[in-house]
């Protein structure tokens, strides 16, 4: 072991992927707080507590940094949602009401019900909108949106399998419809949080799932 008087001279071992993710954290913080235009290399470096040269060491240019930030956002949302999915949708135990409640709880992960999810919604809409005029972002924004669609689809599928939703539900159609609902609610809540409260968002989601069960119970017209 090196003598204590030499410890400060020993080089630090930095995990490149961990550092890249820390820089992505800084991008997310700047964009959520001040908008995409504020996410310059200088501002991101300041947010991360790094020199601009250090950021450039891990990202060749601004486009690569933004692309990684989009990819990292999609990865984090997916990991967080599926950390809950196994617990909420595993097996078919419990009453139909219990399984339905677990489904609703999982889908609420896509709504801005706390600061973390609120920032995710803001970031998702910001990056997706920016991709319309920034070609380097487009493919990656589309991939993020596809990942989120698959998460919703798998959530409904798991709920259907466990008996929380009707067996005859058109999963693809209802996944698109539910994604549109969740996206719309998320955007409205991000823009007008005093009007679109957490209680209101939960109530709308609850009513939507009620409508799926009710439509199935009525049967074909």
Model-inferred region functions:
Residues 104-153:
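Short secondary-structure transition hinges
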Residues 81-121, 171-178:
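Hydrophobic alpha-helical connector segments
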Residues 10-18, 22, 34, 60, ...:
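Residues at secondary-structure transition points
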Residues 118, 138-142, 146, 160-221:
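Hydrophobic/aromatic-rich alpha-helical bundle segments in the mid-to-C-terminal region
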Residues 22, 26-34, 80-87, 123, ...:
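Solvent-exposed, amphipathic alpha-helical segments
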Residues 71-77, 85:
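Short, basic, alpha-helical segments at the C-terminal edge of helix-turn-helix-like DNA-binding modules
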Residues 1-18, 90, 216-221:
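N-terminal intrinsically disordered/low-complexity leader segments
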Residues 22, 26-68, 72:
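Helix-turn-helix
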């Amino acid at each position: 072991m090196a003598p204590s008087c030499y410890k400060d001279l020993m080089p630090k071992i930095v995990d490149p992927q961990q550092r890249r993710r820390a820089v992505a954290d800084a991008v997310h913080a700047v964009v959520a707080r001040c908008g995409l235009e504020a996410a310059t290399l200088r501002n991101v470096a300041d947010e991360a507590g790094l020199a601009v040269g250090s950021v450039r060491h891990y990202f060749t240019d601004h486009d690569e940094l933004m692309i990684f930030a989009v990819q990292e956002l999609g990865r984090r949302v997916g990991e967080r949602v599926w950390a809950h999915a196994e617990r909420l949708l595993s097996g078919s135990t419990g009453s139909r009401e219990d399984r339905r409640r677990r489904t609703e709880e999982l889908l609420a992960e896509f709504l801005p019900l706390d600061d973390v999810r609120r920032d995710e919604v803001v970031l998702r809409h910001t990056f997706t909108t920016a991709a319309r005029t920034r070609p380097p972002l487009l493919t990656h924004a589309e991939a993020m949106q596809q990942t989120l669609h698959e998460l919703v689809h798998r959530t409904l599928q798991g709920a259907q399998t466990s008996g929380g939703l009707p067996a005859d539900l058109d999963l693809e159609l209802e996944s698109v419809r539910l994604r549109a609902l969740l996206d719309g609610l998320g955007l409205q809540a991000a823009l007008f949080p005093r009007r679109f409260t957490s209680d209101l968002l939960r109530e709308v989601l609850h009513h939507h799932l009620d409508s799926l069960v009710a439509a199935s119970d009525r049967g074909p017209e």
